Amino acid sequence: MNHDVIRTASLCAAAVCTLVFTWSAGAQQSGAPAAKRTLVRAGHVLDVKTGKLADAQTIVVVGDTIQSIAPTASVTAQAGDAVIDLGGMTVMPGLIDVHTHLTMNPDFDPYRELTSTSAKEAINGVVNAKATLMAGFTSVRNVGASGFVDVDLRDAVNAGQVPGPHMLVSGPLLGITGGHCDENLLPIQYHLVGDGVADGISEVQHQVRQNIKYGADLIKICATGGVLSKGDDPQASQYTLEEMQAIVADAHRLGRKVAAHAHGAQGILWASKAGVDSIEHGSYINDEAIAEMKKNGTYLVPTLYLEDWQIEKGSLPPFYHQKMVDVSAVAKSNIKHAVQAGVKIALGTDAAVYPHGLNAHELDVYVNQIGMTPLAALQTATVNAADLMGWSAKTGTLESGKWADLIAVEQNPMEDVRVLQDVKFVMKAGVIYKEVTK
């Protein structure tokens, strides 16, 4: 993600309120609280653990929770129940994207982005959170935002002020001076520094604690250089092993997981050795890094569709474009090797490098370019992603006691994952956000 354009800012409450009234009016129709019970009648229910379909099922929802799933013939509607008949559609758990930037958009004039305000980023977040939810993604990790804008966005979603997915958020990214997570566009006299720049053991410990103080659910660091940043090399390590060990130790002690942006093999290796919970991107991963990740149970979060979209449709400045071309030339083959070797994969998209709401296109890449089975691909966006987020008890599968997060599509995604690019029905925590149109 373009961390040159992440600036110190705070969420402007008025910016969120700009769109609250529009949302509130719609909520009276499709986002109203569920009745005492909601019966969701499905033609088929997909078990994402096994890939098996159960035909003619009814999901009984009470409040924000799944109460039961049973054959429709055995479930009788009671007075006061709301009944949602999805006909022959296939119902499955809401999807999860563990690498988003909801407060940003794919506008790649980095100098124009320097003029963006906290109010603009807040409005972006409100619009993009809704687009993501309506695309069938009911949970996300937001891994990078200026000034804790994502913290307040998360809180607004949780309070029901705006529609959006369940969120875990990182706030500002931690990185070295002059690195991918710093601000490198202006000369020294402008004193432009990234929110989370920290060098050395004591500084990184302070930054971890500060991010947590202001509401971060996880810590995001830059272990290597990046693509959408000026003056650095994606293959070059940035944080040292010792700095990352200090970050992970403090974060884990305080109950937070750590995600590491890492393209280069050395940075991937060190980050996994340090104990991070996920590697984001992993473009130049090699056998040594793969072995370390498997030993430690580190998740890999590929972000591959963005390369196709950017090269075909994007308008990157020259100092970004060549790096994107170089990375895309090797990333898919390296990620395919990691998948074949058994590295754990969770779906992440880097949404904001391409338009929000297209998140499900990542699954098509996994199946048709990386060689995953449809079931393995679906698991990256459900059970695996839930596990990485620490939410396996809450979401990732359709089971009694879990959040009533479910989506419906017209065909079986086990036969063609591309059907998930056109989700017809979305329920999150028992609230219907997208209804089937006749």
Language-model features: locations:
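Bacterial N-terminal signal peptides
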Residues: 10-22
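Histidine-rich, glycine-flanked metal-binding segment
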Residues: 31-36, 45, 50-92
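Metal-associated gating/positioning segment near the N- to mid-region
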Residues: 86-161, 177-180, 184-187, 242, ...
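Active-site gating loops and adjacent loop-to-helix segments of metal-dependent hydrolytic enzymes
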Residues: 103-121, 177-193, 227-241, 296-328
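Histidine/acidic-residue-rich catalytic or RNA/ligand-binding cores of hydrolases
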Residues: 107-110, 150, 229-231, 268-274, ...
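Divalent metal-dependent hydrolysis catalytic cores, especially in the metallo-beta-lactamase
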Residues: 124-150, 164-172, 216-229, 257, ...
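Alpha-helix-loop-beta-strand connector modules within alpha/beta enzyme cores
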Residues: 155, 159-173, 235-260, 301-302
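His/Asp/Glu-enriched, well-ordered alpha-helical/loop segment
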Residues: 253, 318, 327-413
